[in-house]
A protein has these predicted regions:
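Hydrophobic anchor at the beta1->P-loop junction of P-loop NTPases
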Residues: 3
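The conserved Walker
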Residues: 6-7
Length: 239
């Protein structure tokens, strides 16, 4: 569904109602307590949802809708559920090769990265996984360690230093490293992205009612989070 309208037309209230209805969803099941007739009864069948809120904090209103299980993820470390996202953590049952391919697409979709930087990024991501004992055809069983964002920064630098590009191209790629990947390692961004484990495993995102507040992240990191979460959910459903 695509919901649009002028300011004040009720878009947010409609979405709040939909989210509340999903979590309080009920289904009819056959009641076997009466052998003389066929009857049905309602049974709670909550449907998890994920709200990515780019501006304001209007969806916190859902906490008044009798959803005690509601989880609000925010960049602020002082919240009950501070946002922690390791992009290199991926669903069990998926091959590493598949995740690397998708993760490169996330980086390129969130940040403008001109060739040949994507090639170096791909090599760097594969390299940090190999440093933790991974092979590209490995299927994730949850037993091996995941690399971190700071490891990617260092590996990207190493891969760049081993190239034979002229100084201008190397300078442009160095700018990509510092402005794109480096932006995910500064101040509060480091606490969000440079972690061993995410707040939730990829599989957990499909089990809870969750709001992710993106307003304070800035455009690039907010785009990165949005694309990453959508990718992890698709990967989980596929795995």
């Amino acid at each position: 569904a695509f919901i649009c309208g002028v300011p004040g037309s009720g878009k947010t209230n409609t979405m709040l109602h939909l989210a509340n209805s999903l979590w309080h969803h009920k289904k009819l099941i056959k009641d076997d307590t009466d052998n003389l007739s066929v009857t049905f009864k309602e049974e709670s069948d909550p449907i998890p949802f994920l709200v990515l809120e780019p501006a304001k904090r209007e969806y916190r209103e859902l906490s008044r809708y009798d959803i005690p299980e509601l989880i609000i993820l925010s960049p602020s470390a002082s919240t009950k559920f501070p946002m922690r996202l390791n992009p290199f953590e991926f669903p069990k049952g998926l091959t590493l090769s598949e995740h690397i391919s998708k993760l490169c697409q996330v980086f390129e979709g969130a940040f403008p990265i001109a060739p040949p930087a994507p090639f170096i990024l791909d090599k760097a991501i594969e390299g940090i996984y190999r440093a933790h004992g991974w092979n590209t055809n490995d299927i994730n069983t949850g037993e091996k360690e995941y690399p971190t964002m700071s490891e990617l920064y260092d590996r990207f630098q190493k891969e760049l230093s081993q190239t034979t590009y002229d100084s201008e191209i190397q300078g442009n790629i160095q700018s990509v490293l510092e402005m794109r990947i480096g932006s995910l390692l500064r101040r509060e961004m480091k606490a969000i992205f440079d972690v061993k484990h995410s707040t939730f495993s990829p599989e957990e995102w499909l089990k809870h009612p969750v709001i992710v507040e993106l307003e304070s992240l800035g455009e690039g990191p907010a785009n990165f989070v949005t694309l990453l979460l959508c990718t992890l959910i698709r990967e989980t459903l596929k795995a």
